[in-house]
Design a protein with these regions (language model features):
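Catalytic core of non-heme Fe(II) oxygenases with the double-stranded beta-helix
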Residues: 56, 60, 64-175
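Non-heme Fe(II)/2-oxoglutarate
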Residues: 1-73, 175
């Protein structure tokens, strides 16, 4: 079974609060041969725990798993704000490095053109993503995906990666 789920988990107002919190923070640009990645240097893990908690509850319910968080700390997770500006893109790649099992994202705005988020099945079929503010997606880190070129505006998302060591599969109570 391929895991690719999406659901609106955050209100437009909540997304605006998250975006405003980081809008003036310095952004590091990291480039490699295949991707362009932007991440905030100053994520406040304690203040942003409510965002992570909402993701965790959704992921646990969707996949019937338990995600372990040591000492209620979000520092065990990769947690990024990523912004793409006109001309930016994120070429086709997968995220199954550093023991990542699942990737989650939250779309914070829709004031951009282009920037389509595309996830591919193992047979290279495209799975659509709804570009609605507050929409979250969850997919297996091994699935290829990309963000097409931003034509206009800025596309901002929160990204969270869950690692294998944090996941315990729940037993089916019917068995």
């Amino acid at each position: 079974m391929i895991v690719f789920k999406q659901k609106i988990l955050f209100t437009e107002q909540e997304c605006d609060l998250i975006l405003k919190k980081y809008i003036d923070k310095p952004i590091n640009k990291i480039e490699d041969t295949d991707t362009m990645k932007y991440k905030s240097k100053d994520i406040d893990y304690n203040v942003d725990k409510w965002v992570l908690d909402r993701f965790i509850n959704w992921v646990e319910n969707e996949l019937n798993i338990k995600i372990e968080v040591s000492n209620s700390s979000t520092k065990d997770f990769e947690f990024y704000l990523q912004s793409y500006k006109a001309g930016d893109l994120f070429n086709k790649h997968n995220d199954n490095v550093y023991n990542r099992v699942y990737a989650c994202g939250l779309l914070l705005n829709n004031t951009f053109k282009g920037g389509e988020f595309i996830v591919y099945t193992p047979n290279d079929e495209m799975m659509p993503f709804n570009n609605t503010i507050g929409n979250c997606y969850l997919f297996e880190a091994s699935l290829s995906h990309e963000v097409t070129e931003i034509v206009e505006g800025t596309r901002s998302v929160v990204l969270i990666f869950f690692r294998n060591s944090q996941i315990t599969f729940k037993r089916n109570k019917l068995l």
